[in-house]
Amino acid sequence: MAAERKTKLSKNLLRMKFMQRGLDSETKKQLEEEEKKIISEEHWYLDLPELKEKESFIIEEQSFLLCEDLLYGRMSFRGFNPEVEKLMLQMNTKNKAEEVEEQTVELDVSDEEMARRYETLVGTIGKKFAKKRDRAIYEEDENGDIKPVKAKKMFLKPQD
Amino acid sequence: MAEAAGVPAESLAGCRARAARTVLDQVVLPGEELLLPDQEDGDGPGGAGERPLRLNAAARSRGRVVCGPGLRRCGDRLLVTKCGRLRHKEPGSGSGGGVYWVDSQQKRYVPVKGDHVIGIVTAKSGDIFKVDVGGSEPASLSYLAFEGATKRNRPNVQVGDLIYGQFVVANKDMEPEMVCIDSCGRANGMGVIGQDGLLFKVTLGLIRKLLAPDCEILQEVGKLYPLEIVFGMNGRIWVKAKTIQQTLILANILEACEHMTADQRKQIFSRLAES
């Protein structure tokens, strides 16, 4: 009796993860697509023609700071408040400095030299802290460069 | 008189929009429409009212034009909303198409984000202070918005203190909020303004005139005697000098210099320098 009548499982049950492990990849893809279709059909959308966004060239601002270069609001004259005088110099030159282009900072050591030093540094320091087994990884090439580290063998989780 | 007044009104209503370039530094009235420079291509004596916006290379290379206070965007044109002189600033670093604004005069301040203002603390409620900045609503100032303030270490602010701060939120839909630190967390001169001194109110236009980079008034004032001034964009100025008399003289000068010519000012300063 039981063999004659196939138990009809519900769609939700079939969609569950443990039921899908036995399916092929093709049927899985089909099911996914169907699901996506259902979801996207349920999403509401406006049935209007596509409106082109008008690119506006005009921006509205209500602040006077953009319009006029105003000085900093706190001022002190003839040494009445030395902190404020220091602030005055700082803030007013900050405004002017933004207009002047930035100058490149002079470096003591060039970038290329830094890169070269780091390349060799990583290897030598790494060797110091590597365990005996790993020290074999740091074999030196003919040129004296350190070979790249090989991938360690780790525990791989078995796939379903 | 009625006839003479009627004729100019008619002509204004009937005239087309003018090019902004031609009206620079002239008085404009609310309701006027201004054309931006690259929209005058088809403008001639027989030009029609509607000009389609051509998205050619010329239009795109214009970049963004900023319309500042006193102007509003109206389609592709600028609509004047305040009466005053039209000003223009060229773009400095090449981005955008410059700034247009109307230089108007008013006494009532409307909070604007980023403005540094002087406020008077009117109430302390819980974690915030209510600060009167001269706008329609008192601004709120959190006690954590001071340099070095933590929950345990509260700033020493009492009702009636003067605060120099800037707005972080200021629009017509919400209550304005101000802080006394900048985005990096440093005070930069903001916070409670010290003891003594005198606070008085002037028009907003005078503040901008005094804070202009090449202001002669301040340079001359600075030579008189040691003093300290704080300008708030809401029309409030706080001054302090060594004696009460000097402070009062300073306050009177600053209030009066709005309506004086340069000669009158120089006369007054020379008289003061003698005494």
Curated annotation (Swiss-Prot), chain B:
InterPro entries: Exosome_RNA_bind1/RRP40/RRP4 (IPR026699), KH_dom_type_1 (IPR004088), KH_dom_type_1_sf (IPR036612), NA-bd_OB-fold (IPR012340), RRP40_KH-I (IPR049469), RRP40_N (IPR048541), Rrp40_S1 (IPR037319). Keywords: Acetylation, Cytoplasm, Exosome, Isopeptide bond, Nucleus, RNA-binding, rRNA processing, Ubl conjugation. GO terms for molecular function: RNA binding. The modification N-acetylalanine is found at A2. It comes from the Eukaryota. There is a cross-link at K151 (Glycyl lysine isopeptide (Lys-Gly) (interchain with G-Cter in SUMO2)). CDD domains: KH-I_Rrp40, S1_Rrp40. Pfam families: KH_6 (PF15985), RRP40_N_mamm (PF21261), RRP40_S1 (PF21262). One of its GO terms (cellular component) is exosome (RNase complex). Its main location: cytoplasm. Gene3D superfamilies: 2.40.50.100, K Homology domain, type 1, Nucleic acid-binding proteins. GO terms for biological process: CUT catabolic process; DNA deamination; exonucleolytic trimming to generate mature 3'-end of 5.8S rRNA from tricistronic rRNA transcript (SSU-rRNA, 5.8S rRNA, LSU-rRNA); isotype switching; nuclear polyadenylation-dependent rRNA catabolic process; nuclear-transcribed mRNA catabolic process; poly(A)-dependent snoRNA 3'-end processing; positive regulation of isotype switching. It is found in: Cytoplasm; Nucleus, Nucleolus; Nucleus. Non-catalytic component of the RNA exosome complex which has 3'->5' exoribonuclease activity and participates in a multitude of cellular RNA processing and degradation events. In the nucleus, the RNA exosome complex is involved in proper maturation of stable RNA species such as rRNA, snRNA and snoRNA, in the elimination of RNA processing by-products and non-coding 'pervasive' transcripts, such as antisense RNA species and promoter-upstream transcripts (PROMPTs), and of mRNAs with processing defects, thereby limiting or excluding their export to the cytoplasm. Belongs to the RRP40 family. Component of the RNA exosome core complex (Exo-9), composed of EXOSC1, EXOSC2, EXOSC3, EXOSC4, EXOSC5, EXOSC6, EXOSC7, EXOSC8 and EXOSC9; within the complex interacts with EXOSC5 and EXOSC9. The catalytically inactive RNA exosome core complex (Exo-9) associates with the catalytic subunit EXOSC10/RRP6. Exo-9 may associate with DIS3 to form the nucleolar exosome complex, or DIS3L to form the cytoplasmic exosome complex. Exo-9 is formed by a hexameric base ring consisting of the heterodimers EXOSC4-EXOSC9, EXOSC5-EXOSC8 and EXOSC6-EXOSC7, and a cap ring consisting of EXOSC1, EXOSC2 and EXOSC3. PANTHER family: EXOSOME COMPLEX COMPONENT RRP40, PNAS-3 RELATED. This is Exosome complex component RRP40. The lineage of its organism: Eukaryota, Metazoa, Chordata, Craniata, Vertebrata.
